[in-house]
């Protein structure tokens, strides 16, 4: 039976459960449940703390897991990323008191508070910077005001929380994170087919969230220009219409770009442009 780790709480929990449900797997009915057996798919799900999931997978106790890329990197567990899931995006950056221009080199000899000490130490070592890293499990932003640290390294969203504590982010991102499906680095043939099947199902759901199917009628004389705008994954589908001067075109397009793509098609003469949701896809 395939053994899969799923976040039991936090921002990754519900989207992960939703994707697995859309992929045809059983959901837990009580948030207190720590395991759920799905006999129809021969899978057992374990609901664990997101920060611990990479450790369980890396040890070989579990076959697959869903966690954050930053959490997997911080764990230093021997895991590899199988698939990016398209939710839970964040950046991990340094921040320090506002009022001056900061650079990573300014951290030399200073105290840095973070919930991700391994990530920070690796980054500092790569830059040749010596600093004191202080591990905190939460509310890292307040550490500077309380005199515990001179700077922090933390997940940064809009920057609003940093601003409330008179901090400003600086330097490049230490880690651009999102939810990922992971497996043990060097995982062998055991349960390989089952791992592949779950990954394919999940990838199909993720793809359906990121792409749309676009259908439109196109004058033949601008078909080359139209297919440059909508090349599809491999190639667009082109079918004749009753009017021989026109063809029907169907192609997958990125959801985030659909409005600009429709604008371009309309500008070159395409008609009846229709965007449709897709739920699943297999490659």
From Swiss-Prot:
Catalytic activity, EC: 2.4.2.17
Which EC class does it fall in?
transferase
* Alphabetically ordered keywords of this record: Amino-acid biosynthesis, ATP-binding, Cytoplasm, Glycosyltransferase, Histidine biosynthesis, Magnesium, Metal-binding, Nucleotide-binding, Transferase
Q: What's known about how it's activated or inhibited?
A: Feedback inhibited by histidine.
To which protein family does this belong?
Belongs to the ATP phosphoribosyltransferase family. Long subfamily.
Q: What does this protein do?
A: Catalyzes the condensation of ATP and 5-phosphoribose 1-diphosphate to form N'-(5'-phosphoribosyl)-ATP (PR-ATP). Has a crucial role in the pathway because the rate of histidine biosynthesis seems to be controlled primarily by regulation of HisG enzymatic activity.
The entry's protein name is: ATP phosphoribosyltransferase
Q: Which organism is it from?
A: Mycobacterium sp. (strain KMS)
Phylogenetic placement of the source organism: Bacteria, Bacillati, Actinomycetota, Actinomycetes, Mycobacteriales
């Amino acid at each position: 039976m395939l053994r899969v780790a799923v976040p039991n709480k936090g921002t990754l929990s519900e989207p992960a459960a939703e994707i697995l449900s859309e992929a045809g797997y059983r959901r837990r009915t009580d948030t207190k449940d720590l395991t759920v057996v799905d006999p129809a798919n021969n899978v057992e799900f374990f609901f664990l703390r997101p920060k611990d999931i990479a450790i369980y997978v890396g040890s070989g106790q579990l076959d697959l897991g869903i966690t954050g890329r930053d959490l997997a990197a911080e764990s230093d567990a021997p895991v590899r990323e199988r698939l990016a899931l398209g939710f839970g995006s964040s950046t991990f950056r340094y921040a320090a008191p506002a009022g001056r221009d900061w650079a990573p080199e300014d951290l030399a000899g200073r105290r840095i508070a973070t919930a991700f000490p391994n990530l920070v130490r690796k980054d500092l070592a790569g830059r040749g910077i010596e600093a004191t890293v202080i591990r905190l499990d939460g509310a890292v932003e307040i550490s500077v005001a309380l005199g515990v640290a001179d700077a922090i390294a933390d997940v940064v969203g809009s920057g609003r929380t940093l601003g409330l504590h008179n901090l400003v982010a600086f330097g490049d991102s230490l880690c651009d994170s999102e939810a990922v499906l992971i497996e043990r680095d060097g995982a062998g043939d055991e349960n390989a087919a089952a791992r592949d099947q779950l990954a394919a199902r999940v990838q199909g759901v993720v793809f359906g969230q990121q792409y749309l199917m676009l259908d439109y009628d196109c004058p033949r004389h601008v078909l080359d220009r139209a297919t440059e705008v909508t090349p599809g994954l491999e190639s667009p589908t082109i079918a004749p219409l009753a009017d021989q001067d026109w063809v029907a075109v169907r192609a997958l397009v990125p959801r985030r770009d659909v409005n600009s793509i429709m604008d371009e098609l309309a500008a070159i003469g395409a008609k009846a442009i229709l965007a449709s949701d897709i739920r699943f896809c297999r490659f």
